[in-house]
From Swiss-Prot:
Reactions catalysed according to its record: (S)-malate + NAD(+) = oxaloacetate + NADH + H(+)
The organism of origin for this protein: Rhodopseudomonas palustris (strain BisB5)
Function text: Catalyzes the reversible oxidation of malate to oxaloacetate.
Protein name per the record: Malate dehydrogenase
Binding sites annotated in the UniProt record for substrate: 83, 89, 121, 152
Gene designation: mdh
Amino acid sequence: MARDKIALIGSGQIGGTLAHMIGLKELGDVVLFDIAEGVPQGKALDIAESSPVDGFDAKFTGANSYEAIEGASVVIVTAGVPRKPGMSRDDLLSINLKVMEQVGAGIKKYAPDAFVICITNPLDAMVWALQKASGMPAKKVVGMAGVLDSARFRYFLADEFNVSVEDVTAFVLGGHGDTMVPLVKYSTVAGIPLPDLVKIGWTSQARLDEIVDRTRNGGAEIVNLLKTGSAFYAPAASAVAMAESYLRDKKRVLPVAAYLNGEYGIKDTYVGVPVVIGAKGVERIVEIELAGKDREAFDKSVGAVQGLIDACKKIAPDLLGR
């Protein structure tokens, strides 16, 4: 039985980490693509040479032409300029929008049936542009955001309570930025909602508020520490979880940037919501009930995303006709 082909557009820190994780999980053969000659080829060879030690048989290829991604089952897009200290995800808009147009054209020509996961920032606007540029069905194009943001929230909570991360569930909705919405009432430790843990004295509301704020600024915290780049281990792990759910038809419920066209009262917008990912892509959008402050925060986050999408429309009006 032939292995799936997984194409990685962009061979920087996230791309290289993705390739290694995919190999370790034996999800398929990997094509690393980059416009920088030698970089994808070098990383592909380096990772391939680790396979005898780690015990996996995936094949790795580096390429500078989109032809190499032909027939890919999954395409993960990391191409673009990364964040630097003092730079917001939104500052990247005009630069990375052009990249998405080029990448979308390449996917449309060589891998039109793939499941596409976008990681490039500003995430929600870039996945919207990528879907428009590629012309692919919206259910086959998603953005990696909520899985990462929820993982950060889960880690901070597990650290706070000194419990296993496996026993912590958490959902972060909305845009992948400072307006994201970590949902405290839908987050639990061994099934116990966080508000109940406040009542029994495990933590305080003030401490939970601090953890929520840290989650919102999780990416910036790492950018400021690294000084020369942004996070790559956790983003790569998050994208691999999404790809695995698709390739193995696991039907996991994951928070991702998904295309909404009526759900949550929102149209023609990509924003973070829980979805079921299976062999058909996004097989179901889970509409949870949002009320009060949660709904206000979600609407504010959606408004921020729509502002970025509107900016994309002004910069590249031809996207609307695709």
